[in-house]
Amino acid sequence: DYLTTHIWPLNWGWVDSADLAGTWAGGEAKVRDYMARHQAIAGRLGKPLVFEEFGFPRDAGLYDPGSPTSFKDRYYRLIYGAVLDSAAKGGPLMGSNFWAWGGEGRAAHPDHRFAPGDRLYVGDPMHEPQGWYSVFDVDESTKAVIKAHSAELARMS
């Protein structure tokens, strides 16, 4: 028995994909507060907590594989830092699951939208642009952030 939460700064209006540089600080503060409040709830309930679904857009609101992910990488490091900090202190936050692995998948259409009959899937649901939150096989910096976090967790166990 454990608790889960989602964290979606863009969907919740905490950042603006057209101005990530200008809205990052405010969004980061809201994410930090949200994480702290949910860790406190988990602590009071005596339950482990997993940030089981979190994602962040690519820079400049782009969706294409290989487009810049500098703010996504910062966001992942923010989430992963909270997980590592909790693990080091014996806190309730036990893990996280990013949304979503797109791998070698690619959007079928230039507008990144699903069309009737489409079967290609890159992690983002069909009502969202494909590539919005996906981590693709060519996203080297994001993969490096994920790999470093995994290695740090392994060292702690």
Q: What residues fall within each predicted segment?
A:
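Glycoside hydrolase catalytic-domain groove-lining segments
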Residues: 1-62, 81-84
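Aromatic-rich peripheral "rim/lid" segments of glycoside hydrolase catalytic domains that contact
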Residues: 61-78, 82-157
